[in-house]
């Protein structure tokens, strides 16, 4: 097993075969996810104005790729600012390492995540990047705690893009995995 590798079943087989009982590994992070918005639902049959809670399933599946512990915090409604603030205070003293929210991070009336996050002692804070899809994204670390918060956009494609380009590299860095380098290609139209 090499450094910066995620242990798989074949590694376990080799270690047990060789009689190796203890190896040094990184702690498995605990990730708590919240969806936000009055329009978000987990129901099968939905009215036209509702949106299926697809972001939680997407984030859960991506987090499970790392074998991290995923906890679904449920759906926070548009007026759940105080509920969210109380949950954050409680989380600060829990085993949760990373909080990820989906929605409520832009500049609208019900976009409460940035307002609540500002109330805490933060470092490495940003709230917007120049990419589309995915412009409204929040990242913060709580000073004195090993906890990070990502506020992703509510739009599923924007949320997936921000997860891929911001959360995913952060998770890799927690494990000590080197970031993937990308090849840049110029595309040409051919019709």
Region annotations inferred by a language model:
Residues 3-72, 90:
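Short, glycine/charged-enriched hinge/interface segments at domain edges or termini
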Residues 19, 27-30, 125, 133-135, ...:
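A generic structural signal for well-ordered coil/turn residues at beta-strand boundaries
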Residues 54, 111-112, 190:
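Secondary-structure junction/capping motif
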Residues 58, 66-180:
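Short glycine/threonine-rich loop/turn motifs
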Residues 34, 140, 188:
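Residues in well-ordered beta-strands of folded domains
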Residues 2, 184-191:
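Single conserved hydrophobic/aromatic residue that forms the stacking wall/gate
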Residues 51, 139, 163, 185-186:
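Generic structural hydrophobic/aromatic packing signal, biased to beta-strands
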